[in-house]
């Protein structure tokens, strides 16, 4: 059976799709790209926003319309959070949650045998353990993601993810080390550790995120270890000190801000204020001279006044993020914020997004200007039209002239100029 995969959402979803791809291959099936003929399609959904749900439905209907005879498996966070709505999507032959991604192969083979529609969604349990399969590779990438944590117990008022993902659970250190060794042998030199609430890694255990970095960095072939999205209030001085001591650690800190206004942060049930965040960024930049701080910012949250938005805008400009992902608040049924007063219109959200993106791009441009004249080690990924592109340790995009394939190589590059969203350099 030829199987193709569609992935929406975060790096954890990308990892889990890769796990399903490997599981199908191990069972004797053939993974194929989306533009090749296929017998089955797996759609791994996201539900962080209403737009994510819309895109999932759109892909589902398109796949069914263009492939009426294919087996379609709908899984992921949308299914887990809104199972009855997912069940009603009759274009899917199999609807299954994300509690055990390994079972997608079993469901597909069962449907292939008897043709009966399958609906299997079980709730996450407090006693649930980390059970995501270990990967041996990561298709079509030069850096590998490694999922080391699942679940979230923080319950930000806007977020449905605790419902979709359950409580915090962590991958054992021995499994991290073993998977890193396997990825190293497969030719990967950089690993990105990812999770739903990554800084909660090790909660209730006798290890933490620093131990995870050290375990992933153990193989000689692994030259870089990067962290995914981080919660600011977990980043203590001791954590920064231990990360600094790990020579393979990449000094990019993606610290989820969400808002630069204290009143808004309080309504969001975030666990810090702007004073704490400002101090943390200062401490990071003191410990890591070449650090980049990147972030996510939400605009148009329930009750966000123009004054609150202006404070958030000013804070983003003050911090000077290397990169900012800007997105509009999406009202999600099942969250506290769904019932909050002061819901913002779509038009106002769009206008605030425009203003925030404008500020974010200005900060990014300024950050890249400061790299000019420096020599940075770049992990090259893509090549096109006589240019090769890759990323520095602090995740700045760099482009160089090159007619040869540099994919997967880490080379020193002298930064000679900067554009709005990338730098230009010469290989030394």
What are these regions (language model features)?
Residues 6, 75, 194-196, 228-230, ...:
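Generic beta-strand/beta-sheet core signal
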Residues 47-52, 188-219, 231-238, 265, ...:
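Conserved glycine-rich "GG(E/T)P / GGGxP" loop and the immediately following alpha-helix
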Residues 159, 163-166, 225-233, 259-269, ...:
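Conserved strand-turn element in the central/C-terminal portion of the radical SAM core barrel
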Residues 176, 193, 227, 255, ...:
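Conserved, mostly hydrophobic/aromatic
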Residues 185, 210-224, 235-295:
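Radical SAM/AdoMet-radical enzyme domain recognition
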Residues 304, 319-321:
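Contiguous mid-protein beta-loop-alpha structural module that forms a pocket-lining wall or clamp
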Residues 339-428:
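Terminal RNA-binding accessory module
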């Amino acid at each position: 059976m030829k199987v193709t995969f569609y992935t929406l959402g975060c790096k954890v979803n990308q990892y889990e799709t890769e796990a399903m791809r490997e599981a199908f291959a191990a069972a004797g099936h053939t993974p194929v790209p989306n533009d090749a003929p296929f017998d089955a399609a797996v759609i791994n959904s996201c539900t962080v926003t209403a737009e994510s749900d819309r895109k999932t439905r759109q892909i589902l209907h398109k796949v069914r319309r263009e492939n009426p005879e294919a087996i379609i498996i709908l899984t992921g966070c949308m299914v887990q959070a809104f199972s009855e709505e997912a069940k009603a999507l009759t274009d899917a032959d199999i609807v299954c949650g994300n509690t055990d991604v390994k079972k997608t192969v079993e469901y597909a083979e069962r449907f292939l045998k008897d043709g009966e529609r399958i609906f299997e969604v079980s709730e996450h349990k407090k006693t649930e353990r980390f059970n995501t399969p270990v990967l041996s590779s990561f298709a079509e990438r030069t850096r590998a993601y490694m999922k080391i944590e699942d679940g979230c117990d923080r319950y930000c008022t806007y977020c449905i993810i605790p419902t979709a993902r359950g409580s915090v659970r962590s991958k054992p250190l021995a499994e991290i080390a073993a998977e890193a060794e396997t990825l190293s042998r497969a030719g990967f030199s950089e690993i990105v550790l990812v999770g739903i609430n990554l800084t909660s890694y090790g909660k209730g255990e006798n290890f933490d995120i620093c131990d995870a970095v050290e375990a992933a960095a153990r193989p000689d072939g692994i030259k870089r270890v990067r962290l995914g999205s981080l919660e600011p209030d977990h980043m203590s001085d001791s954590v920064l000190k231990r990360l600094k001591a790990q020579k393979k650690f990449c000094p990019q800190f993606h610290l989820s801000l969400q808002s630069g206004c204290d009143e808004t942060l309080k309504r969001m049930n975030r666990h810090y204020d702007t004073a704490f965040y400002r101090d943390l960024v200062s401490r990071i930049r003191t410990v890591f001279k070449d650090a980049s701080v990147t972030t996510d910012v939400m605009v148009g949250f329930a009750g966000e006044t123009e004054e609150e938005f202006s404070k958030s805008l000013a804070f983003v400009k003050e911090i000077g993020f290397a990169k900012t992902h800007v997105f509009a608040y999406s009202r999600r049924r099942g969250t506290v914020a769904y019932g909050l007063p002061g819901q913002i219109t779509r038009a106002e959200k769009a206008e605030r997004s425009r203003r925030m993106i404008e500020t974010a791009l200005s900060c990014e441009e300024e950050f890249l200007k400061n790299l000019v004249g420096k020599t940075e080690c770049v992990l090259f990924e893509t090549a096109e039209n006589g240019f090769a592109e890759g990323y520095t340790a602090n995740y700045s995009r760099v482009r160089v002239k090159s007619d040869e394939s540099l994919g997967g190589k880490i080379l020193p590059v002298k930064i000679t100029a900067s554009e709005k969203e990338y730098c230009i350099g010469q290989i030394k």
